[in-house]
UniProtKB/Swiss-Prot annotation:
The gene is rplF. This is Large ribosomal subunit protein uL6. Belongs to the universal ribosomal protein uL6 family. Keywords: Ribonucleoprotein, Ribosomal protein, RNA-binding, rRNA-binding. This protein binds to the 23S rRNA, and is important in its secondary structure. It is located near the subunit interface in the base of the L7/L12 stalk, and near the tRNA binding site of the peptidyltransferase center. One of its GO terms (biological process) is cytoplasmic translation. Pfam families: Ribosomal_L6. The keyword Thylakoid does not apply. It comes from the Bacteria. GO terms for molecular function: rRNA binding; structural constituent of ribosome. One of its GO terms (cellular component) is cytosolic large ribosomal subunit. SUPFAM superfamilies: Ribosomal protein L6. Part of the 50S ribosomal subunit. It comes from Trichodesmium erythraeum (strain IMS101).
Amino acid sequence: MSRIGKLPIPIPKKVTITIEGQKVTVKGPLGELSRVLPPEIAVKEQENTIIVKPQEQSRRARQRYGLCRTLVANMVEGVSKGYEKRLVIQGVGYRAQVQGKTLVLNVGYSKPVEMPAPEGINIAVENNTNVIVNGINKELVGNTAAKIRAVRPPEVYKGKGVRYAGEVIKLKAGKSGKK
């Protein structure tokens, strides 16, 4: 039995859950998410909690059991609170701006890099150097933030580039030179 999978998922008051076979739909104040779970996983709603259990004792069911519980818990938290990732742009002349639903990054390339925001994701910029990605789908928020970071990952000598807020870049020493 999975230690994570055994835990019941509490349902906040403003969130409603619909279970139709293997499809779980979660509605809340921020929006609606749905996901189809694998056939070897059973989902039940009891009182104000959701319980995820394996339908069979196969190896595959045990592998996916904790994952499915976490995915449903992330959906519940997403529609009630939402998710946010912050990125910091560091470097001389490096900056970001939002034009409509598109993020425009000037990070040292000959042309600005334009990144359209996926459906359900909001991108905001503070002070031209702080990018905020938020939405209700944890997976989509994380993937969007990772794509923005991948445009110009932090380099190890000066630390220039796009990094997550709170991420520590271990800087290397440059060449020693002749004495």
